[in-house]
């Protein structure tokens, strides 16, 4: 069923009172995060526990870039806080269309963790990748695994119609279509890059430590005979032994020794390789192919 609602606040109040899982869709700067916060404020004010899942791996508001993050909210005052994520899932890229499988699994796993932690409303703030094969594939599989009963599509014109049509053909879901939030400022590419760099800078805040690592601790597994220097400056997800991401790290190779620089080394059991190199001076990133890093092809 398709519903057109003119008031963002009206819909936020309705979802806060009735919904259990809501997925927000929209292109850049359409107000997904703003609406997510409206819903969370209204729901927590009514005594509900909200699991906010931020699946925007480029400019995340929960956790660092390259990760899907989740926070459990019980009070309206928590909604706008800059606070550590209660759970992270490392994806390892800034472009969700490059690693669709990892993106979908990361989002679905944190939706499940939010429910297990006691959330009676989960709000999924998705990426701005909404068009073409990549956008539709990403959203189709997120719908398939997360199973929201309400979807909100924010649009400036009619750009969301193809993806809305696809979701309604394949899923029994109520879709609400709203115009883009009028108060949302359009950010320039430079502003987005600055926000991304600041998020990575926070992820590598002091106290940082170097931990010597063995070639056997990685996923995917390193090929035999790999020149470890090829891993220098690669971004990694630091994982415990329970399938949970503790935070980010950066590999450093010097004098034949491989180390990881991180502030979450306690409890570290394994490292997941990302598809980015990180410059710690500027916190700018450069995409890389793991196939090329490992096999030179």
Regions found by a protein language model. Give the residues of each.
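Preference for solvent-exposed, low-hydrophobicity sequence contexts
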Residues: 1-17, 24, 42, 149-297
